[in-house]
Amino acid sequence: MPIVKVRENEPFEVALRRFKRSCEKAGVLSEIRRREYYEKPTQVRKRKQAAAVKRHMKRLNREQQRRQRPY
């Protein structure tokens, strides 16, 4: 868990904002959402495979767009 020390004369809102930013960088919220419910190993593999296919298709589409002439 990220730790944020409140500086002298620092408003609470600023410290809270720094804490939220450090939590987001550490991936705490995404980890909590991922572990909220048990996911079977087959579902994990299927989800990762689908994400890989989606990334690949996105990359292909970007390359295809680059090769087309804009007229």
Swiss-Prot record:
Residues 60-71 have a biased composition (Basic and acidic residues). Signal peptide: none annotated. InterPro entries: Ribosomal_bS21, Ribosomal_bS21_CS, Ribosomal_bS21_sf. One of its GO terms (biological process) is translation. The keyword Transcription regulation does not apply. Belongs to the bacterial ribosomal protein bS21 family. This is Small ribosomal subunit protein bS21. It comes from Halorhodospira halophila (strain DSM 244 / SL1) (Ectothiorhodospira halophila (strain DSM 244 / SL1)). The lineage of its organism: Bacteria, Pseudomonadati, Pseudomonadota, Gammaproteobacteria, Chromatiales.
